[in-house]
Amino acid sequence: MAIFKDIAGLRQWRQSLHGTLALVPTMGNLHEGHLALVRLAANRAEHVLVSIYVNPLQFGPGEDFANYPRTLDQDLQRLHEAGCQTVFTPDDGLMYPRGRQDISIVMPPRSLSKVLCGASRPGHFAGVCTVLSKLLHMVAPEILILGEKDYQQLRIVQQMVADLNLNVQVLPGPLQREADGLAYSSRNIYLNLAERQVAPLLAETLFDLARRSTNDAAVSDLAATGWERLERAGFLPEYLELRDAQTLQSLALPQPGARWFAAARLGQIRLIDNVIIS
């Protein structure tokens, strides 16, 4: 396995390649959701590069940057077993050599970034756009693989790529779930046993709302029912909303292809999920 920690070695390797390259950016602590993205990349490109970097720029004050799980040796083993042969593991000194307080920032489109997670995490998506812009310039892939679990992030990056005329195709990877329906997340390991037993109710609630989202259903009534269900189970909901899948504008009435989005805390852990109306 080739592991690059500097830009010079990475670019030398990149220039030697023949054929398409897919980039799968991650923050490590890899799980089956990440590995599914790696497999998707291998099916769509002749070469795959996985980046592992916990980006401090996308964490706000009081968030879990210091405690975010860092499991590099385990991640490399999982990638090796999945057939991935090339990994980029930059550090803060490489990504932000002058520090993080006075750097050029890539601002996300306002209409997509001020709602949902952006409403409670100011600066988060600017951090995401900045680090992904840097990675795209360093790696120069033909394909960028992003999961639909972070659907708002996916839409923001798709729009950023279009707005900045970046020469890369953004390819979505379907959201992956554990056997009981809970969306895979690196933060799931922080759930205690009791919380882990309750956690799948977030997905159950969204799937139930999607099934009940008929043409004449009132979104406000559906959302209120789902919100109450989550609260009864011990969640502290942050949002539960039906939005257009492209514009992320809120909807008063269901429509095919729209998505239900939810964020809720269970104990100290913030969970997010989304389900499409089929």
UniProtKB/Swiss-Prot annotation:
Active site: H34 (proton donor)
Cellular localisation: Cytoplasm
Entry annotated with the keyword Ligase: yes
Pfam families assigned to the protein according to its UniProt record, in alphabetical order: Pantoate_ligase
Domain of life assignment: Bacteria
GO molecular function, a single term: pantoate-beta-alanine ligase activity
EC number: 6.3.2.1
GO cellular component terms given for this protein: cytosol
Pathway: Cofactor biosynthesis; (R)-pantothenate biosynthesis; (R)-pantothenate from (R)-pantoate and beta-alanine: step 1/1
Biological process terms in GO annotation: pantothenate biosynthetic process
InterPro entries, A to Z: Pantoate_ligase, Pantoate_ligase_C, Rossmann-like_a/b/a_fold
UniProt: beta-alanine binding residues: Q58
Keywords for this protein: ATP-binding, Cytoplasm, Ligase, Nucleotide-binding, Pantothenate biosynthesis
Binding site for ATP: 27-34, 147-150, 184-187
Other comment: The reaction proceeds by a bi uni uni bi ping pong mechanism.
Family under the similarity heading: Belongs to the pantothenate synthetase family.
Protein name: Pantothenate synthetase
